[in-house]
Amino acid sequence: MKLLCGFFLLWLGLVGNLAQSDPSPKEEESYSDWGLRQLRGSFESVNSYVDSFMELLGGKNGVCQYRCRYGKAPMPRPGYKAQEPNGCSSYFLGIKVPGSMDLGIPAMTKCCNQLDVCYDTCGANKYRCDAKFRWCLHSICSDLKRTLGFVSNVEAACDSLADTVFNTVWTLGCRPFMNSQRAACICAEEEKEEL
């Protein structure tokens, strides 16, 4: 009962203060403007979180492709200089993967570098980049087979490793791809908003 009375008194106090304050129309406009701006900002923040979550899951509807907000094609960012490819190390869920995870196979590092360059090219298609990456990895196994002759255990292990690395990139590579595309591209409407 005391709690109910407390809420009632609080409500009366708030209603009384609102009735006493008679803001001028100018103040009211700025208050409603502020409210609309805050509301818009909140929706944009929620949308940004949803987009980030979708990137972690592999993109919207399972499609990982960078698009501008109003359906226009992204354009290369003027003056953008891509980062140096960093081999097979990267960030996973925002945490730097240690260099020790890089297997240090020069041919594999070459494949990873090609993937980095592809991701950093504005307008690239993630699935084409990934397909080239898979082909590069499996070409290592083919070269190994030619060098060592027919050794089924080595060939099977190599193919298995190549498929594992490829599937990891295919499944978890949407976020790095989208981050690279955001850095390499600009959308016409973004340029207007920044002015």
Curated annotation (Swiss-Prot):
Single GO BP term: phospholipid metabolic process
Keywords recorded for this protein, A-Z: Calcium, Metal-binding, Secreted, Signal
Cofactor binding, note field: Binds 1 Ca(2+) ion per subunit.
InterPro entries to which the protein is assigned, alphabetical: PLA2G12, PLipase_A2_dom_sf
Residues reported in the UniProt entry to bind Ca(2+): S89, Y91, L93, D116
Cofactor(s) this protein cannot do without: Ca(2+)
Localization in the cell: Secreted
GO molecular function: calcium ion binding; phospholipase A2 activity
GO annotations of cellular component type: extracellular region
Domain of life of the organism encoding this protein: Eukaryota
First and last residue of the signal peptide: 1-19
Primary localisation category: secreted
Record function comment: Not known; does not seem to have catalytic activity.
Family to which the UniProt record says this protein belongs: Belongs to the phospholipase A2 family.
Protein name: Group XIIB secretory phospholipase A2-like protein
Species of the source: Mus musculus (Mouse)
Gene that produces this protein: Pla2g12b
